[in-house]
Amino acid sequence: MTTYFTPPRPRVFGHRGASGLAPENTLPSFALAVTLGADYLELDVHATADGEIVVLHDPVVDRTTNGCGPIAELTWSQASALDAGFRYTADGHSFPYRGQGVRMPRLAEVLCAFPAQRLNIEIKQGAPPIVDAVLAVLEAAQSLDRVLLAAEHDDIMAAIRSAIGGRVATGMCVGDVVAFIDRVTRDDWNGYARLGDALQIPPAHAGIELVTAASVAAAHRAGLEIHVWTINHAAEIERLLDLGVDGVMSDLPGLVATAVKHRKVSRG
């Protein structure tokens, strides 16, 4: 049986697709990430006013489209008419995806378009709650086994864990991460029980180094994978792989794929 964790490690994640090279969280961005070697597509979801689960990072559409306002106040008909390539620019001057028909996709469309990829889905919206609606989309696409559900906020993650009953892999919310890093700092693991399947964190936060040899080793002892975001420099990718992380998320997934490939070749 194939699952979210079936592909070999280290895992190559396309962060919002190949968002350094194409409009984030769109089908062209995801397709480019796959072409560049990503086995995993990281994305974010919200709901429209009429309940469609759409792939979008922000609660508003202003930053990535030619529209404005909260996605929760737009119907799917209105959201799907927006130009999701309108704001993308690699150089700050040219906008190659404007007017090219790039649209905000529904989660169901991404699942259908990329049946061989694993999806890392962050549920951004807490109110009104959309966990059940996301699960319904996953069940309809028979994709529960190839996704990991993530959430930054503790209340959303609690809702996820309550709803899934162990059927879907999960990440760790802020509260989980704080508790884990505190354990690493104190080197006290008495009574610790992991709540998720993967610790997905940046290398550092608020001046505190999070990804260290100690935290990687502790994660592995606890049965957790450790995935690091969002890394867009080859030297930093190499450093993290040297530490033994299980996956790297990047806006430029080709950099991660190249580093992983070279390691496999060098090891025979």
Predicted regions and their residues:
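Active-site mouth loops of central-metabolism enzymes
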Residues: 14-24, 94-102, 171-179, 205, ...
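Active-site beta-loop-alpha junctions enriched in small/polar residues
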Residues: 17, 46, 50, 58-59, ...
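Solvent-exposed polar/charged
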Residues: 35, 39, 112-113, 162, ...
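Metal-dependent phosphodiesterase/phospholipase catalytic core, i.e.
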Residues: 3-4, 9-10, 57-167, 192-222
